[in-house]
Swiss-Prot record:
Protein role: Dermonecrotic toxins cleave the phosphodiester linkage between the phosphate and headgroup of certain phospholipids (sphingolipid and lysolipid substrates), forming an alcohol (often choline) and a cyclic phosphate. This toxin acts on sphingomyelin (SM). It may also act on ceramide phosphoethanolamine (CPE), lysophosphatidylcholine (LPC) and lysophosphatidylethanolamine (LPE), but not on lysophosphatidylserine (LPS), and lysophosphatidylglycerol (LPG). It acts by transphosphatidylation, releasing exclusively cyclic phosphate products as second products.
InterPro entries xref list: PLC-like_Pdiesterase_TIM-brl
Protein name (Swiss-Prot/TrEMBL): Dermonecrotic toxin SdSicTox-betaIIB2ii
Catalytic activity: an N-(acyl)-sphingosylphosphocholine = an N-(acyl)-sphingosyl-1,3-cyclic phosphate + choline; an N-(acyl)-sphingosylphosphoethanolamine = an N-(acyl)-sphingosyl-1,3-cyclic phosphate + ethanolamine; a 1-acyl-sn-glycero-3-phosphocholine = a 1-acyl-sn-glycero-2,3-cyclic phosphate + choline; a 1-acyl-sn-glycero-3-phosphoethanolamine = a 1-acyl-sn-glycero-2,3-cyclic phosphate + ethanolamine
Cofactor note: Binds 1 Mg(2+) ion per subunit.
Expression tissues: Expressed by the venom gland.
Length: 274
């Protein structure tokens, strides 16, 4: 999976897909009551990137629905996963539940359209910190209460804050999640990062019966050398400001026979066993 990073402007969707991404990550900014308002990262962000692009969240969902609906004039077959970077760290922790209700409701209304939409992308809910676990509970409660639990098949969760992996596992168990789990590891492209935690996450992914890391990805990669190093470790995906660079590396002799771009037929909630 190659995730285009910080795709918050509508015009950026095609830009990152044209560069080779098959997934996009966008930031969800909330008001202090937990209402999802806009796609917006804000300052600071990655070196060399403009942090200020934004779109009304519901408008973004309406647009991306078209892009991920087969038969729609805007359909782009390669876009198979949407990663929602939930900026919950900017609101009081007690509002995490309200935020989960709001995001689920807006996905129901504007992306899935309560059964009318044929939009098919997988959804990855990226939470910054384990303290925000009530968002997950609220999201699932809302789908259940509204009668649309079938959408859980397309939804996964992921914690992005580089916290202790055992704490992550405990929190996921607390909210009853033991499948559809990704594990991120990374840092802004402005800095270098070691691979100890990433290696441990990969080890857990490859442990039979471990259900809290079906896929492991690294963020945010810009250097060719870093991409090569992490591919050698066996990551399932990367997030990058330059998807075209990732595509280039994947075509190199060392990796061409070991990796390929994920397609819609690849299940993101299933461990790859070769």
């Amino acid at each position: 999976w190659i995730m285009g990073h910080m795709v918050n402007g509508l015009e950026q969707v095609s830009e990152f897909l044209n560069l080779g991404a098959n997934a996009i990550e966008f930031d969800i900014d909330f008001d202090q009551n937990g209402v999802a308002k806009i796609t917006h990262h804000g300052i600071p962000c990655d070196c060399g990137r403009l942090c200020t692009k934004q779109t009304v969240f519901t408008e973004y969902l309406d647009n991306i629905r078209h892009v991920t609906t087969p038969g729609d004039p805007k359909f782009r077959e390669q876009l198979i996963l949407l990663a929602l970077d939930l900026k919950l760290q900017r609101i009081p922790v007690e509002k995490a539940y309200a935020a989960g209700v709001d995001v689920a409701t807006k996905l129901l209304d504007h992306y899935w359209q309560r059964g009318k939409s044929k939009a098919r992308a997988y959804i990855l809910l990226n939470l910054p910190l384990v303290q925000d676990y009530e968002f997950i509970r609220a999201f699932k409660d809302t789908l259940k209460n509204e009668g649309y639990e079938q959408h859980n098949d397309k939804v996964g969760v992921n914690f992005t804050g580089n916290e202790d992996l055992d704490e992550t596992r405990k929190v996921l168990k607390k909210v009853g999640v033991d499948k559809h789990v990704w594990q991120a590891d990374g840092i802004t492209s402005c800095f270098a990062r070691g691979t100890d935690r990433l290696t441990e996450a990969l080890k857990r992914r490859d442990t039979p019966g471990y259900n809290y890391a079906y896929k492991v990805y690294a963020w945010t990669l810009v250097k060719y050398s870093t991409m090569r190093r992490l591919f050698r470790l066996g990551v399932d995906g990367v997030m990058s400001n330059f998807p075209d660079r990732v595509v280039e590396v994947l075509k190199e002799e060392e990796f061409a026979d070991k990796f390929r771009m994920a397609t819609y037929d690849d299940n993101p909630w299933k461990k790859f066993t070769g």
